[in-house]
């Protein structure tokens, strides 16, 4: 393990506490925002800025920047290759025309549709708080994506269209806080669903569902001595662990993640932009909690 106590030892672009506070106190609007936060929120912000803790990669502004397939297509492709258990390359980011309710959109960190080079499609979501009825909801959006693919291929190929042209549609969902059903399996963080018959008959039904419970992964990893067993677990560690010692371990075992952290810490040099990300996250978390409480009350 690297001998280091603070992430600044690995990433010298990280600013000091004094530099951050000096920048905040130079601008009245930044000072007003900073002191509008609770004391524990100010501490969390400074810890994140100064390397006392890692950045929370599931913050909307960070995740979308680091995993943006238009900026760095290999990153999302590499992650999805580990999720699917086979090498894939992202060819296109498709327009996401799926109709969503406003309250649902507020619960999503990432909602992106990508096409692989072999024509398969994946809808990738990151949810801060898992929705109620995750199976029914996923089925509806998978059906919508499948219908969109059918219409697109039919329009492109016209009389040459065949249903054999339909490629698998994957719905891949990462939960930061998993729905209660997932806690019935406290040792399993990745669940794959497909359609099978009760007779053994095999048909190609092009809908697959993969759910990854990050909170269950984190607890399981901690119980196993914080080991990183494979490259998928390396990605999940990157997404959900912000302890410096875990980041050091990840960098030692998988040094290719250094470039991702460097991108994030370059973003963090913009104190005003970072405060906007943090303020937005605080507001959206309050909205998510209120929405979850409303949905629970309706059950």
Predicted regions and their residues:
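Elongated, amphipathic alpha-helical interaction scaffolds
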Residues: 1-298
């Amino acid at each position: 393990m690297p001998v280091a106590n603070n992430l600044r030892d690995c990433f010298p672009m990280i600013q000091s506490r004094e530099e951050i506070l000096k920048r905040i106190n130079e601008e009245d609007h930044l000072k007003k925002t900073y002191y509008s936060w609770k004391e524990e929120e100010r501490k969390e912000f400074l810890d994140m800025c100064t390397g006392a803790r890692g950045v929370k990669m599931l913050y909307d502004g960070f995740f979308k920047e680091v995993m943006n397939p238009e900026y760095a297509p290999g990153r999302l492709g590499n992650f999805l290759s580990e999720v699917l258990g086979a090498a894939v390359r992202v060819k296109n980011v498709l327009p996401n025309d799926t109709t969503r309710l406003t309250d649902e959109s507020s619960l999503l960190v990432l909602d992106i549709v990508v096409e692989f080079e072999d024509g398969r499609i994946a809808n990738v979501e990151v949810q801060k708080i898992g929705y109620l009825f995750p199976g029914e909801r996923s089925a509806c959006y998978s059906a919508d994506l499948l219908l969109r693919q059918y219409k697109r291929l039919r329009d492109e190929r016209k009389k040459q269209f065949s249903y054999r042209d339909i490629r698998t549609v994957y719905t891949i969902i990462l939960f930061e806080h998993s729905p209660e059903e997932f806690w019935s399996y406290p040792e399993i963080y990745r669940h794959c669903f497909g359609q099978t018959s009760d007779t053994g008959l095999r048909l190609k039904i092009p809908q697959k569902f993969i759910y990854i419970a990050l909170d269950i992964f984190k607890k399981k990893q901690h119980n196993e001595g914080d080991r990183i067993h494979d490259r998928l677990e390396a990605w999940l560690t990157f997404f959900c662990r912000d302890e410096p010692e875990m980041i050091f371990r990840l960098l030692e075992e998988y040094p290719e993640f250094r470039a991702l952290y460097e991108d994030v810490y370059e973003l963090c040099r913009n104190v005003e932009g970072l405060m906007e990300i943090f303020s937005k996250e605080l507001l959206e978390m309050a909205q998510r909690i209120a929405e979850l409480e409303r949905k629970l009350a309706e059950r």
